[in-house]
Design a protein with these regions (language model features):
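Hydrophobic alpha-helical transmembrane segments and adjacent short intramembrane/lumenal linkers
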Residues: 88, 93-173
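Selected alpha-helical membrane-embedding segments in polytopic membrane proteins
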Residues: 2-101
């Protein structure tokens, strides 16, 4: 995939998530590529906090062990496979025809997008402060939930977006 194709996929993910899901599914990535992408997503996750870590004083980071790069990697290494399995199981239970590789590619891509949005939010927060950071992070989570609903609807082949909403809720709750 070229840089222009990647940029278009990022834009489509935010503006036309169903088209982005179709594009991701059509890539038909093999399991070794998916595992590599998952590892990349896990390892890159701490970079979303890089601006905060670089430009914050040591005093402001007291008690911030939960957000250390090692902890972020450990949590992501546990959560990402669980999230993929949860979405796949929920899609199947709700009558969808989702394939594991299709669910994996959209979940991994969505998590990479969340990391990108968190990084951008952290950069903006350097200028705008912590209140702006909280606002941008909340907006990022809402956007990602909307993207998850659209992606799950496409990969599971549901006939109703409301079934996908329920699927996303069940995947995160269960």
């Amino acid at each position: 995939m070229t840089a222009a194709g990647l940029t278009a996929l990022v834009r489509d993910t935010l503006a036309r998530p169903r088209a982005a899901a179709d594009t991701l599914v059509k890539l038909d990535l093999k399991p070794d590529v998916l595992w590599t992408a998952a590892a990349l997503s896990i390892v890159l996750a701490p970079l979303s906090r890089l601006p905060f870590l670089l430009f914050s004083s040591v005093d402001s980071m007291q008690g911030d062990v939960a957000f250390s790069p090692v902890m972020i990697i450990l949590v992501r290494a546990i959560v990402l496979p669980l999230l993929i399995c949860a979405f796949w199981i929920v899609a199947r239970v709700l009558g969808g025809k989702a394939e594991w590789s299709h669910v994996a590619v959209v979940v991994i891509w969505t998590e990479l997008m969340l990391g990108l949005m968190s990084f951008a939010s952290s950069l903006v927060a350097l200028v705008g402060g912590q209140d702006l950071l909280r606002l941008l992070q909340t907006a990022s989570v809402l956007i990602i939930l909307w993207v998850y609903v659209q992606f799950l609807d496409v990969v599971a082949g549901f006939d109703s977006v409301w079934r996908a909403v329920g699927g996303v809720a069940l995947a995160f709750i269960g």
